[in-house]
Amino acid sequence: MSPDELTDEVISRLAETPNERLREVMTSLVRHIHAFAKEVKLSEEEWMQGIQFLTRTGEITDEVRQEFILLSDTLGLSSLVDMINHGSELQEVTESTILGPFYVPDSPSREFGESMVEFDDGGEPAILSGRVMDAEGSPVGGAELDVWQNAANGFYAVQQKEIQPSTNVRGRYFTNQLGEYEIKTVRPVPYPIPADGPVGMLLRDTGRHEWRAAHVHIKVS
């Protein structure tokens, strides 16, 4: 049996999968993962290293830390899935992006221009303002902006439940009739992703750093 015949045989075993979408996904997965192994001429040692890497990724994952999502993020798969599902052909609109691991629903509703800082750790004061417009450039009044970021110490409130108030530097704001919003906050800072696990090891082995640029998350609805 040749490698190509083996691939065809495995795919044929999936032909009776009752769920049509599952059959489509698994057939494509088998075809592409076999093609990958053949393209790079995967050795038995490399195959086992990959198995052990995925095993460690699962072992370090718990209800707080999702190492598999971190792996997906660093491989660009998370962003690709977001683009496929939420991308727009309109060049004028703001691009969608992944939600990230620190989003918490039901943040407090805050007034126009109100501060969302509830924990003073010496951060640099900042004002975030702008306008929400539709694809035609008209202002969108009453749009909800669900906003969250890290504190000046580099951590999100959800990461420091014993130190920061749970709603520190997060809140829901609403645009006025002109589509304007204004938020008082502190300047966000760069922070590293968790690098003490297998994904961190992979980043180091491939010459990449673990730092994310300073940013503010805004979910508009």
Question: Which residues are covered by each model-predicted region?
Answer:
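Beta-strand-dominated extracellular/periplasmic modules and repeats
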Residues: 1-221
